[in-house]
Amino acid sequence: MPDYRSKTSTHGRNMAGARGLWRATGMKDEDFGKPIIAVVNSFTQFVPGHVHLKDLGQLVAAEIQAAGGVAKEFNTIAVDDGIAMGHDGMLYSLPSRDLIADSVEYMVNAHCADAMVCISNCDKITPGMLMAAMRLNIPVVFVSGGPMEAGKVKFRGDEKAIDLVDAMVVAADDSYTDEEVAEFERSACPTCGSCSGMFTANSMNCLTEALGLSLPGNGSIVATHANRKKLFLKAGQLIVELAKRYYEQNDASILPRSIATKAAFKNAMTLDIAMGGSTNTVLHLLAAANEAEVDFTMDDIDELSRRVPVLSKVAPAKQDVHMEDVHRAGGIMAILGELDRANLLDVSVPTVHEKTLKDALDKWDIIRTEDPDVYEFYRSSPGGVPTQVAFSQNRYYSTLDGDREKGVIRNAEHAFSKDGGLAVLYGNIALDGCIVKTAGVDESILKFTGSARVFESQDAAVEAILGNEIKAGDVVIIRYEGPRGGPGMQEMLYPTSYLKSKGLGKDCALVTDGRFSGGSSGLSIGHVSPEAAEGGAIGLVEDGDTIEIDIPNRTIHLNIDDATLAHRRTVQEAKGWHPKEERKRKVSKALKVYAMHTTSAAKGAVRVL
């Protein structure tokens, strides 16, 4: 039976000094011997998804204390990708994921904590904490701050639901007046919480449900609703139970690596494909699997993408649907329930809250349960009042959305598409693969052939798009923006948004070794591997080359002969793999260290030492 890790610093004559310091934090005689639970918070006033988390760590801590544990809170950093977008700040976003993972490891191991509650929300924070949980392999429960309510704007006689991406698109569309743009800006983000669509933050918080590491509703109930408080209270109670089961009953089945097995990772990816989640989730699941020492690869993702249908379309894939609508339809447990009925899940896997995923679905899937409390939970609605306060409203929808033929969540028979919401493409321009969010691609351009317009940076591409230099039929190539080449693998939300602004969303493709925001849609192909900076063929594309994209057949092809490609490679290798044009970009020592150790997107952009 394993000893409590904290016993290292709380027991024995020689630990008198350490105990003296513990006492200075408020511990008493009776606390030594209880499990010490790290409450890993990520409050910051920089990020709307985290601005309301300040007091929630202590809310969880009080439940831990009441359940017989000792709670000790600390904070990680949190980068807001939307605010960091469009300038050199975005270079720091993906590297912050690894910094978060390291900071959690440092704090938990330095102080010998026994278990963790991870309070996350936005883009790189949930993945960073997930990587740390897999690395540390101690009992953990994830609970996120929750989605923002969708914005509402009265525009030209109609009220419509909007989000951050809408504000970005109209800002670059000359058909909108300054006053109209300002109204979109003021209305797009009305409350605290992670941006309201199926963007990266919400995608990852949904995937923690499928991995079995968070409670039902974690990914879908809005941040402002009083019922979300129940998740935080339950997390505090549950983590003490899990810690005692492991350390006092030798039950290793509740450890993260016992729960997040390869089957669980495949379940999570299946969910991601079915709900058209962010392409960033591919990076993050690969990275978490790497930390868990699970053999989960791009090949697994490719295989799943060929047989999992799209059961839900949420903004940006369907602009009038947001996370609050997914919750009303039964949330993630409802999507998992439909996947189970289609025999696309392994429901024998355990979770932190039920013995198996099957048990969880029997209890929480609104189609199979008759529990009125579950129905009420999923009727939790937005409040419609701008606020930065968590749990500040208690409004309910009058009914649930249980329509599985035409509703927000469909069954497999009535799927939005029989082909999955994400796809892995291979070809001579991407030997190790690249990713496209097919749920956001118009059917008319699933097969696309166009002429390359090559840019050595995101900034140059944006300038060309806004300068009306991009025409219908172009394939915009943005390279040297990968994990190593950026460095930091910037998101390309501005280029994709501006293509929409210019009316080119269905007439152009964008191909990059960088990545995309979860808010991106259109024929946006990212994570091209190998990246240009490590000798990838994307670095050999020239203006005017023909690029052939065939999503149904999972191919992307640079249409030049092998001899020409080989000649270009010889010439480029002599020059070195770096941008042909100098970029106005300050690369700090921290970013240089990241670039030295990072791997390609095909491996999750993890570090190799």
Swiss-Prot record:
Cofactor(s) essential for the protein: [2Fe-2S] cluster; Mg(2+)
Residue numbers of N6-carboxylysine PTMs: K124
PROSITE patterns found in the cross-reference section: ILVD_EDD_1, ILVD_EDD_2
Catalytic activity: (2R)-2,3-dihydroxy-3-methylbutanoate = 3-methyl-2-oxobutanoate + H2O; (2R,3R)-2,3-dihydroxy-3-methylpentanoate = (S)-3-methyl-2-oxopentanoate + H2O
Keywords, ordered alphabetically: 2Fe-2S, Amino-acid biosynthesis, Branched-chain amino acid biosynthesis, Iron, Iron-sulfur, Lyase, Magnesium, Metal-binding
Domain of life: Bacteria
Pathway: Amino-acid biosynthesis; L-isoleucine biosynthesis; L-isoleucine from 2-oxobutanoate: step 3/4; Amino-acid biosynthesis; L-valine biosynthesis; L-valine from pyruvate: step 3/4
Annotated residues for binding of Mg(2+): D81, D123, K124, E491
Enzyme superclass (EC): lyase
GO terms of molecular function: 2 iron, 2 sulfur cluster binding; dihydroxy-acid dehydratase activity; magnesium ion binding
The protein's Enzyme Commission number: 4.2.1.9
Binding residues annotated for [2Fe-2S] cluster, in chain numbering: C122, C195
GO biological process: isoleucine biosynthetic process; L-valine biosynthetic process
PANTHER family found in the cross-reference section: D-XYLONATE DEHYDRATASE, D-XYLONATE DEHYDRATASE YAGF-RELATED
Function of the protein: Functions in the biosynthesis of branched-chain amino acids. Catalyzes the dehydration of (2R,3R)-2,3-dihydroxy-3-methylpentanoate (2,3-dihydroxy-3-methylvalerate) into 2-oxo-3-methylpentanoate (2-oxo-3-methylvalerate) and of (2R)-2,3-dihydroxy-3-methylbutanoate (2,3-dihydroxyisovalerate) into 2-oxo-3-methylbutanoate (2-oxoisovalerate), the penultimate precursor to L-isoleucine and L-valine, respectively.
Family note: Belongs to the IlvD/Edd family.
NCBIfam families named in the record: ilvD, PRK12448.1
Oligomer and partners: Homodimer.
Protein name in UniProt: Dihydroxy-acid dehydratase
